[in-house]
């Protein structure tokens, strides 16, 4: 497929087929049988399995597509410019300047 280097199309299709089988193996639970609590528990277990399938799918794609094993370094500003002073935060513009600017004429 265009735009990727070093990835075989057959490997990618194989990964997609594996992921498709994983998702098909966990259909949404039947909501017409059982008590409300039983249906709720089935949905809760289904969501937990979906989270597991999603995590496995990410690992499969990562193995087939590769990618950086370590997080990408983000450019940070110089440490001298970083402060924890709340006065320099720009949360609501104009709120601090209004507190002490009462003029009497």
From Swiss-Prot:
> GO: which molecular function terms?
DNA-binding transcription factor activity; RNA binding
Which BP terms from GO are recorded? mRNA transport; viral process
Q: Does the keyword Secreted apply?
A: no
Q: Where is this region: Disordered?
A: 24-49, 65-105
Bias class Polar residues marks the residues at 24-35, 95-105
Chain intervals for the UniProt region annotation (Homomultimerization): 18-26
The places in or outside the cell where this protein is found are:
Host nucleus, Host nucleolus; Host cytoplasm
Quick one: where is this thing mainly located? Answer: host cell
The answer on whether this UniProt entry bears the keyword DNA damage reads no
GO cellular component terms listed in the entry, alphabetical order: host cell cytoplasm; host cell nucleolus
Instruction: Kindly provide the PTM information from the record.
Output: Asymmetrically arginine dimethylated at one site by host PRMT6. Methylation impairs the RNA-binding activity and export of viral RNA from the nucleus to the cytoplasm. Phosphorylated by protein kinase CK2. Presence of, and maybe binding to the N-terminus of the regulatory beta subunit of CK2 is necessary for CK2-mediated Rev's phosphorylation.
Keyword line: AIDS, Host cytoplasm, Host nucleus, Host-virus interaction, Methylation, mRNA transport, Phosphoprotein, RNA-binding, Transport
Q: Which residues carry this modification: Phosphoserine?
A: 5
Find motif (Nuclear export signal and binding to XPO1) and give its ranges: 74-85
Renumbered to this chain, the Basic residues biased-composition regions fall at 37-49
Question: Where does motif Nuclear localization signal and RNA-binding (RRE) map?
Answer: 35-51
Q: Which family does it belong to?
A: Belongs to the HIV-1 REV protein family.
Q: What does this protein do?
A: Escorts unspliced or incompletely spliced viral pre-mRNAs (late transcripts) out of the nucleus of infected cells. These pre-mRNAs carry a recognition sequence called Rev responsive element (RRE) located in the env gene, that is not present in fully spliced viral mRNAs (early transcripts). This function is essential since most viral proteins are translated from unspliced or partially spliced pre-mRNAs which cannot exit the nucleus by the pathway used by fully processed cellular mRNAs. Rev itself is translated from a fully spliced mRNA that readily exits the nucleus.
> What does the entry's free-text domain comment contain?
The RNA-binding motif binds to the RRE, a 240 bp stem-and-loop structure present in incompletely spliced viral pre-mRNAs. This region also contains the NLS which mediates nuclear localization via KPNB1 binding and, when the N-terminal sequence is present, nucleolar targeting. These overlapping functions prevent Rev bound to RRE from undesirable return to the nucleus. When Rev binds the RRE, the NLS becomes masked while the NES remains accessible. The leucine-rich NES mediates binding to human XPO1.
What is its quaternary makeup?
Homomultimer; when bound to the RRE. Multimeric assembly is essential for activity and may involve XPO1. Binds to human KPNB1, XPO1, TNPO1, RANBP5 and IPO7. Interacts with the viral Integrase. Interacts with human KHDRBS1. Interacts with human NAP1; this interaction decreases Rev multimerization and stimulates its activity. Interacts with human DEAD-box helicases DDX3 and DDX24; these interactions may serve for viral RNA export to the cytoplasm and packaging, respectively.
**General remark:** HIV-1 lineages are divided in three main groups, M (for Major), O (for Outlier), and N (for New, or Non-M, Non-O). The vast majority of strains found worldwide belong to the group M. Group O seems to be endemic to and largely confined to Cameroon and neighboring countries in West Central Africa, where these viruses represent a small minority of HIV-1 strains. The group N is represented by a limited number of isolates from Cameroonian persons. The group M is further subdivided in 9 clades or subtypes (A to D, F to H, J and K).
- For this entry, the protein name equals Protein Rev
- Organism the protein comes from: Human immunodeficiency virus type 1 group N (isolate YBF106) (HIV-1)
- Which lineage ranks, top first, belong to the organism behind this chain? Viruses, Riboviria, Pararnavirae, Artverviricota, Revtraviricetes
């Amino acid at each position: 497929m265009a735009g990727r280097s070093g990835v075989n199309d057959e490997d990618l299709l194989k990964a997609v087929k594996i992921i498709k089988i994983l998702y098909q193996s966990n259909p949404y639970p039947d909501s017409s049988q059982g008590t409300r609590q039983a249906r709720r528990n089935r949905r809760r277990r289904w969501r937990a399995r979906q989270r597991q399938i999603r995590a496995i799918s990410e690992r499969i794609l990562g193995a087939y597509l590769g990618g950086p094993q370590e997080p990408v370094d983000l450019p940070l500003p110089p440490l001298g410019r970083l402060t924890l002073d709340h006065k320099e935060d720009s949360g609501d513009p104009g709120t601090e300047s209004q507190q002490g600017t009462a003029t009497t004429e």
